[in-house]
């Protein structure tokens, strides 16, 4: 009996392991796995259904078909366990062994493994230094390869076709060895001496000059070193023994009607066995060479198809013309082993049902149908029934439950008390898509969901379904309650703002009760306290909207945790006073003394959470909801067709527009305007008309006339149902109301261009047939877009999760002093995001000083909370260096200080938080809200005039930032740098707006000047680029000869003459190489030098420049010598929305990217080559000049003799992130990418915290490229993991050796995921075959550091509560390590001990 118990016990012993290694299997290893050789292609006997002996399902090899029963039935039952039947040869064991026992096939001729042959780069090809084509010709018996040339003139590895082979045979006889097929390849691989080759390559690489050659050699070297280090032998890439999968993993299932369903693998194996047996027979018969060769080739093809069908040639198809599923197909793709069964599994104790509203639930509850609860909690009920003695055995309990006896329901209620369940709605786009609730038993069959969590789930009640899961163990229940309970997830992890916010009906109810109406019943009364208001309202003596005075008692908490009680009389309305009753103590009355629109309610909940804490907020949110529902019911707001009031002015506006359009049409007909201008003007007109109609409509809707209590007619905000819905933010928007009651406006054609004739009707009037037809396109496109968007957005999320999955908070502080410089985010002069918002929840990296002093006001290491934000804004600080995930120096993972605040909890992030996944979810989840389209700039948008001045919006003080300028005689400043900015600060010194100043801008104010709102402080000509002098002197023309390099032209209007420089291709031969310039000379006739340099002040003039000064003229500082006309910039399409975000994360190089200066120095133009300009930058430090060829059509922002700094823009265009990283560094890159991505999301009104984008960026910057290898084992140009290089460099510097130098590399998220250290994670992401091939050849180890790898091997993930488990395991293992001591050490210690005791 004891034996029996042990038998059941030893099934699940746990193997402790820390890493998984993948490698090539040697033939010996394959034989050692095997339980016998499969010799026949038969599967099962069609009459008896018993497996055939030696066949693919043979019971002798793979084990019995039934538990503990041999095939012939001689031995049955457990007592014969382990006996091998002498009659049928089957071991008596569990049938389960048929899932684990493998067999093998001895191949009659070796076969190359297709993965190592065809998966690029071909590993066999690299090792043998042959092209894939050549190897294939050998393998598929088209040519011979020389294996051993002997004393002949042939070379090893040389290919010979039939003719050449026979010629060689005649010439040399048996002196050489040349063969074909996989055996030849195997011989060659076997003959490679790795050590010798590695040495040879290491010597050869430094001596080669060509880049491509070096690349090829270092690839080969890497592969050889990998083979040497991993213990794999090259010849193992050619199979001599083929393993056979256990039969239960490729089942053969009898269907009714005598047919069988079989796994495709059986067909593939059958082909291999058939061909192999035939080949054996042919070899025994010593058949003619040509027949044997053909059979060998067929065997090679059969094995190829088994391993990876369709990789070479046409895929082998089954009876139904469908390609057979090979071993490779089993593991790759969405339906493969990795993604289907290892990363996503189905779980028991779960159910799903439709959801409905549960308006009476509390926030931590959900309604669970009794039927579902009974099924889900069955084991608990059985246990309880037995414990109570209501049932004697589990079987009896089961019967009771099946009969649904009354006591079962009592027990159920007891079992589910405080036992949380998890509710999940697919698609689970972020972690709030699964939350825990306490179940409340309900009748009916639908799950009831609390309305406030709908926003987090993105759920609505139009037929959505949700799944319920039961956490079984105590630990699981604890985690569900502590971490996943809906009441613990009030803030969104994406932006730290409340996600439990009322919407729709609740908002409408709260808005309705806090509106005021003129002359309502009870207006002007004064109440002693809130109770009195309540009584009077219930008695019907005062209306809900009446303006009254109320004495209130409030307790206001301040930031420091203290509170102040005060009593005051406020002017308010009855409704607001009633609402204040549910507001928790600690908040001021002012929070409700306003119409509660959606934004205000959200702010209120946020404030409540920050001031009075979680528990109060949860209770308050529930109360708000109940109140909102109650009052929206009382309000009786509904929509009737008469609520859509069409403005009377509509007809007049449309008629006027139609007249103007006719006017433009007639101008076009008489040729005064072009087609394009007409189109733009018409579109412009109609857009204006549409805006006017909607303005008229909204002003109509939003006001109504009433008589106040003095009998005077006054305007008050309207109580129109539709207006209230839109105004409160409950439902609808001005744009939607415009289509209902205004006019629908302009529509787009399928190609995206706008149709000139708008739809003047609205939905209330109804559309004509033509109007309806025009509008169908847009509607259908919208639906098609949505479907595409969902797929694209999901794919983006998947890539993001994959790149960031192993990023976990692993320590408190990495001790770095680096960080990112945070400044307010400015767009078009306005501050879009003030500094306070950007630093909230971050840790300060370096002390912040009070402006203009040495006093530290915020010490480094401070976590900035709301209190500090106020403080920073009070002290008008405009830049702060904060810690960031990008600059964190933690080796594996990230530290809590660099990450800062956990946005969903409001305090510093805990160790073990999976911040990478949270970042990926936060960015991916709103993906479906982004647009898919590319904005074509057309119509009204393309004609926005180029900016030509800075007009300030707010009064304040002028500040100039890194602006190089010269002062003109009239006192104005002229900008002579490209990156200057002008900012306006308010009286507190806070920056309100900031503008870029182009080169040549004339600035009419100076640093520190006060300006009023609306004043123009700088001006420039947007259509020309001036060349400004920085000194005064006399102009001298150089190389400017009329008719050769220049031409004079007279302006017809003004009569002024201009000199225009001719383009080189328009000049006569004499002028081709002359470079016209304007030189400055002093009074003594000597050349003037540019200030601070020894470069003569001469300005070379590019083609088409207009010179405005005469030869010999005197000019002053800041005068314009010449103007270069700017071609009006081509209207570029702005890629918006989701595609733009994907491009940024994939780090794609844009087309026609902007060109940046590679070094700091002086610009010059060298000799032009065909269609390109040669730009030369001479560095100021005297190093070698840098040259670059730039296409002629690119417009350059720089001119000869100008100073540029490294990374400055030379030619405009979209920025290339790789250039920014290379020239300006990591923080500039971070700033660029964060701002670009935020712009896309901000356009859709989505808030995401910067740190999530930085977290993904950290993962994209994991790799470095080796620039100099030093004494390390790295090869120049290798891409290595940053941490790996740093560890190696530390080791080298302790040994006083030369460390390697490297540059940071930016990888796109797909590439970064595939180049991760973990091959399991990479293989389960994409390109499974390639990843596994590479990992096997190099014998990679996966140390299971990320989350994904651990899910795949079925362990707790090293994040959250799992991190503690992993670190505890590590600690235990360190303790258990045996310490090895040598005998001599023991002896020495003993003598020492004896001596000391002797003394």
UniProtKB/Swiss-Prot annotation:
Binds 1 Mg(2+) ion per subunit. GO terms for molecular function: DNA binding; DNA-directed RNA polymerase activity; magnesium ion binding; zinc ion binding. It holds the Pfam family RNA_pol_Rpb1_1. Zn(2+) 2 binds at residues 814, 888, 895, 898. InterPro entries: DNA-dir_RpoC_beta_prime (IPR045867), DNA-dir_RpoC_beta_prime_bact (IPR012754), RNA_pol_asu (IPR000722), RNA_pol_N (IPR006592), RNA_pol_Rpb1_1 (IPR007080), RNA_pol_Rpb1_3 (IPR007066), RNA_pol_Rpb1_3_sf (IPR042102), RNA_pol_Rpb1_4 (IPR007083). One of its GO terms (biological process) is DNA-templated transcription. One of its GO terms (cellular component) is DNA-directed RNA polymerase complex. The keyword Transcription applies. It comes from the Bacteria. Zn(2+) 1 binds at residues 70, 72, 85, 88. Its EC number is 2.7.7.6. Mg(2+) binds at residues 460, 462, 464. Its cofactor is Mg(2+); Zn(2+). SMART domains: RPOLA_N. It is an enzyme of class 2 (transferase). HAMAP family: RNApol_bact_RpoC. DNA-dependent RNA polymerase catalyzes the transcription of DNA into RNA using the four ribonucleoside triphosphates as substrates. NCBIfam families: rpoC_TIGR. The RNAP catalytic core consists of 2 alpha, 1 beta, 1 beta' and 1 omega subunit. When a sigma factor is associated with the core the holoenzyme is formed, which can initiate transcription. Belongs to the RNA polymerase beta' chain family. This is DNA-directed RNA polymerase subunit beta'. It comes from Pseudomonas savastanoi pv. phaseolicola (strain 1448A / Race 6) (Pseudomonas syringae pv. phaseolicola (strain 1448A / Race 6)).
